[in-house]
Regions:
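Rossmann-like NAD(P)(H) cofactor-binding subdomain of soluble oxidoreductases
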Residues: 59, 65-74, 78-153, 169
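NAD(P)-dependent Rossmann-like dehydrogenase/reductase catalytic/cofactor-binding core
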Residues: 203-207, 232-242, 250-344
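Structural beta-sheet core signal
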Residues: 10, 33, 105-107, 138, ...
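Conserved active-site and cofactor/substrate-binding residues in soluble primary-metabolism enzymes
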Residues: 11, 19, 39, 86, ...
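NAD(P)+-binding Rossmann beta1-loop-alpha1 motif at the extreme N-terminus of oxidoreductases
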Residues: 1-57, 64-67, 94
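Internal alpha-helical scaffold of NAD(P)-dependent oxidoreductase catalytic cores
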Residues: 87, 98, 123, 130-135, ...
């Protein structure tokens, strides 16, 4: 296969999809961006700004918006999926006729499908099957879309099984402010990007309750242990979670003021109801949906996930966040790593 990448299509014009599209277009790569909302499409076309999802960022002339999926996919060497996880399958079904010539499908979605408990690579396998002959990759890491749009230094992980194709994509996406590292652990990178959103809701709730820095640090650290346990049970490499797609993305999402998931948690910690919060935002807090999937995955694989379980009870059973913290703190006492070495 010829690995040259001359055109990229990005499916989804939320903040992340628009930021990636603008990054590539500013570097000189022609980009076609699929925009679902008519109003957003007209904004980008007429004002060169996505005021709804990436306000204040002037978009490069090399970025072309389209409302037709067929037009957006025309001539693409790489197709980037940047849609929320709950619509990923449906959009991919609509894209099936337009994959001729696409060398790599790159998933920028951070989530898990609730009905099937599949990560996006598995959804791709089920939807496209043997009809798609190209590669699959995913990208994750500590990367707020607004900061990428402002050209602030950012580093992410790109996971793909074929190193040569990975290096070709790495070259296309990397700039003086956006650094891409390669990995071969697709499962780990996908799960790190998805599960950190659940922990971020918990971290936000702790902040909203006013429990301080000690509590937040403990929750992040023990949350990473849960992400790693579940990831390894699902076939991921444990060291992936010590990298950008693991602890990097987790720390950012649990501490950054731009984190939608942390914001949801903070508001719940301050006494607001989830339905009130979600009804007043156009941005997607993926962690709300991912919490349900993560809870079910813990049951399916028999993995102990106390923090994720408590976030689930807060969101879906209406549990008082203070009671959830109390129950976490008064659980049976344990060793940190689960066992003692034979000699010490």
């Amino acid at each position: 296969m010829n690995l040259e990448i001359s055109k990229v299509s990005i499916i989804g014009a939320g903040g992340w999809g628009t930021a990636l599209a603008n990054l590539l277009a500013a570097k000189g790569t022609p980009v076609r961006l699929w925009v679902r909302e008519r109003e957003v499409f007209e904004q980008i076309r007429d004002t060169r700004e996505n005021k709804e999802f990436l306000p204040g960022i002037r978009l490069s002339a090399g970025l072309e918006p389209f409302q037709s999926l067929e037009d957006a996919m025309e001539g693409a060497d790489v197709a980037v999926m940047a849609v929320p996880s709950h619509v990923y399958r449906g959009v991919l079904e609509r894209l099936k006729p337009f994959f001729a010539g696409v060398k790599c499908l790159l998933s920028a979605t951070k989530g898990i499908e609730n009905d099937t408990l599949m990560i996006m690579s598995k959804v791709k396998d089920e939807v496209l099957g043997g009809t798609y002959k190209g590669y699959f990759a995913c990208i994750a890491g500590p990367s707020f879309a607004g900061e990428v749009g402002l050209r602030h230094p950012t580093a992410v992980t790109l996971a793909i099984c074929d190193r040569q194709m990975g290096e070709a994509i790495q070259q296309v996406f990397s700039t003086e402010f956006f650094r891409v590292y390669l990995s071969d652990d697709i499962t780990g990178v996908e799960l790190g990007g998805a599960l950190k959103n659940v922990i971020a809701i918990g971290a936000g709730a702790v902040d909203g309750l006013g429990f301080g820095h000690n509590a937040r640090a403990a929750l992040i650290t023990r949350g990473l242990a849960e992400i790693t346990r579940l990831g390894v049970a699902m076939g991921a490499q444990p060291f992936t979670f010590a990298g950008l797609a693991g602890i990097g993305d987790l720390v950012l999402t649990c501490t950054g003021d731009l984190s939608r998931n942390r914001t949801v948690g903070m508001r719940i910690g301050r006494g607001e109801r989830l339905d009130e919060i979600t009804s007043h935002t156009s941005m997607v807090a993926e962690g709300v949906r991912t919490t349900l999937a993560a809870y079910r995955l813990g049951l399916k694989f028999g993995v102990d996930l106390p923090i994720i379980d408590e976030v689930y009870r807060i969101l879906y059973e209406g549990k008082d966040p203070k009671a959830a913290v109390r129950d976490l703190m008064t659980r049976e006492l344990k060793t940190e790593r689960g066992h003692y070495s034979q000699e010490c």
